[in-house]
Amino acid sequence: MALDLSDVKRIAHLARIETSDDEAAQTLAQLNNFFSLVEQMQAVDTTGIEPQAHPLSAVRDMVQRLREDVVTETDRRADYQRPAPATENGLYLVPKVIE
């Protein structure tokens, strides 16, 4: 996948980023280099390779020290919502700003 200058300018416009022609050209080169790298990685045949959740254990004989998945803090939602001007069902109510 390769972008052209009009793609970069359109993306910048959608993101509300003002760019000069030189900046757009530099960004185009960087994005196309990135997409080229992604295409190279996707072209690698990974058939039969098991995904690694902890890649360090494949390189070294080490055990990952993972903490227990337990709650360590109390629920303070009510405390945080008490000073709010308006809440409902645990959510903050705010004025509508977009129609």
UniProtKB/Swiss-Prot annotation:
EC number, UniProt record: 6.3.5.-
GO MF entries: asparaginyl-tRNA synthase (glutamine-hydrolyzing) activity; ATP binding; glutaminyl-tRNA synthase (glutamine-hydrolyzing) activity
Domain of life where this protein originates: Bacteria
Keyword Nucleotide-binding listed: yes
Keyword terms, alphabetized: ATP-binding, Ligase, Nucleotide-binding, Protein biosynthesis
InterPro entries tied to this protein: Asp/Glu-ADT_sf_sub_c, GatC
Catalytic activity, as annotated: L-glutamyl-tRNA(Gln) + L-glutamine + ATP + H2O = L-glutaminyl-tRNA(Gln) + L-glutamate + ADP + phosphate + H(+); L-aspartyl-tRNA(Asn) + L-glutamine + ATP + H2O = L-asparaginyl-tRNA(Asn) + L-glutamate + ADP + phosphate + 2 H(+)
GO biological process: glutaminyl-tRNAGln biosynthesis via transamidation; regulation of translational fidelity; translation
Subunit comment: Heterotrimer of A, B and C subunits.
Database matches in HAMAP family: GatC
Family per similarity comment: Belongs to the GatC family.
Function field: Allows the formation of correctly charged Asn-tRNA(Asn) or Gln-tRNA(Gln) through the transamidation of misacylated Asp-tRNA(Asn) or Glu-tRNA(Gln) in organisms which lack either or both of asparaginyl-tRNA or glutaminyl-tRNA synthetases. The reaction takes place in the presence of glutamine and ATP through an activated phospho-Asp-tRNA(Asn) or phospho-Glu-tRNA(Gln).
Protein name, as recorded: Aspartyl/glutamyl-tRNA(Asn/Gln) amidotransferase subunit C
Species assigned in the record: Cupriavidus taiwanensis (strain DSM 17343 / BCRC 17206 / CCUG 44338 / CIP 107171 / LMG 19424 / R1) (Ralstonia taiwanensis (strain LMG 19424))
Lineage: Bacteria, Pseudomonadati, Pseudomonadota, Betaproteobacteria, Burkholderiales
Gene label: gatC
